[in-house]
Amino acid sequence: MSNDVKLKVYLETSFVSYLTGGVTLNAKIAADQAYTRIWWERERSEVEVFISGYTLAECEEGNATRAAERLGAIKDVPLLPDRSDEVVLLARKLIDGHALPEGETTDALHIAAAAVNGMDVLLTWNCKHMANPHTLPKTRQIIASSGFFCPAIMTPKTFIENTEMEVSHV
């Protein structure tokens, strides 16, 4: 997948949590963690990876040991510039336009941060509010009508599968 121009990929907090998550008996979560780690090892060097202050703040929360693991994993990932006025305004539009529910401000802020900063892809395991095929059309419409490009919002699994399809068709 080596091109002259690298994709700009935004990492939402669930990505970081799955990357550093401990052993689980939940088979689905274990599989998702495995996809996340595969993406991190195989795809990260092929793209430009970014986080926002929202990702950083959420990674600092919770159990101190787990927080340290999350922060350690992203310590070298560039932080997007603070464009908070634009991000907050777009996030509000996403909620007011019913692309995301009223109580999901942080999810809206992640999407808005990625859009305002010109990301190509937003990686997340949040399929309820973010990587949801039922809400994505509304999200795209609101972002486009606000003058921004909507990043492809997907799971690491989808990213890997799409990359494998791209390579197999070459």
Residue ranges and their predicted role:
Residues 1-51, 60-71, 96-102, 136-139, ...:
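Short, well-structured N-terminal submotif of metal-dependent ribonuclease cores
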Residues 8, 48, 122, 151-152:
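A residue-level structural signature of the nucleotidyltransferase/glycosyltransferase Rossmann-like core
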Residues 55, 61-64, 78-80, 88:
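Short, contiguous, well-structured surface segments enriched in hydrophobic/aromatic residues
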Residues 69-73, 77, 82-83, 155:
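Extended, non-globular alpha-helical segments
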Residues 78-137, 160, 167:
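Active-site neighborhoods of divalent-metal-dependent phosphate/nucleic-acid chemistry enzymes
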Residues 131-152:
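C-terminal end-helix/capping segment
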Residues 146-170:
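C-terminal interaction segment
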